[in-house]
């Protein structure tokens, strides 16, 4: 973990390293799984790391509920719809799910993804990376948030499943093609 609270590819911890919300989200999930599994780190402690990660996630949040790839002031601080779910889920896993950034992110998700998921579209409505995290964040929140998000995503996704159980690459899978569409979809359920 870098001093800014985020993580970088290849676990680069030098000052000014390329930390981003995507890599940070993966590490938050790993730390939370380790915590639930009773695994104790050899250096530092999980709660401190999660507090720092929450701080980093807040630095990547925007007032409108979007999240940026990198924190403000870095080379890629562009707000991206695909990062809202990872930002909200990370804050939830860090114990900061009631933060303003998490609440605004959930509000953004409901306003902008509360429509039927379009499996074949080549836009953010079919971005499995976005929904991989968004489904988990909405489920963690529960209530009306989960009901609305699940309704928008579930039926279209189940309807896209082939008779052999696979999911064809959708309109916005990224470079992983069939592997991405199946792994991302299975994890979303």
Regions found by a protein language model. Name each.
Residues 1-155, 162-189:
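An alpha-helical repeat/solenoid feature that recognizes helix-turn-helix modules
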